[in-house]
């Protein structure tokens, strides 16, 4: 799986991951503000929410 792995303020970067999922994490009240992206599907703590997907570069 190829996932985006950059933090919000950094340029886009990708990584080939061993996990079968990618994720993006954002603040629940502001879905447009994505704080980070990466491999896997971590559990988020309030006020963050994680959205996971199963496709190359699906966490855009």
UniProtKB/Swiss-Prot annotation:
Here the disulfide bonds are 3-22, 17-39, 41-52, 53-58
Show the segment(s) annotated as Important for binding to L-type calcium channels. Answer: 41-48
Cellular component GO terms held in the UniProt record: extracellular region
Which SUPFAM superfamilies does this entry report, sorted A to Z?
Answer: Snake toxin-like (SSF57302)
Which InterPro entries does the UniProt entry name for this protein?
Snake_3FTx, Snake_toxin-like_sf, Snake_toxin_con_site, Toxin_cobra-type
Indicate whether Disulfide bond appears among the record's keywords.
Answer: yes
Q: Which family does it belong to?
A: Belongs to the three-finger toxin family. Short-chain subfamily. L-type calcium blocker sub-subfamily.
Q: Where in the cell is it found?
A: Secreted
What is the recorded name of this protein? Answer: Calciseptin
The answer to whether the entry has keyword Secreted is yes
GO MF annotations, alphabetized: calcium channel regulator activity; toxin activity
What is known about what this protein does?
This specific blocker of the L-type calcium channel (Cav1/CACNA1) is a smooth muscle relaxant and an inhibitor of cardiac contractions.
Q: In which tissues has expression of this protein been reported?
A: Expressed by the venom gland.
Question: Other remarks on record?
Answer: The sensitivity is higher in cells of the cardiovascular system. Neuronal, and insulinoma cells L-type calcium channel are more resistant. A total resistance is found in skeletal muscle cells.
Instruction: Report keywords, A-Z.
Output: Calcium channel impairing toxin, Cardiotoxin, Disulfide bond, Ion channel impairing toxin, Secreted, Toxin, Voltage-gated calcium channel impairing toxin
A Pfam short name:
Toxin_cobra-type
Q: Which organism is it from?
A: Dendroaspis polylepis polylepis
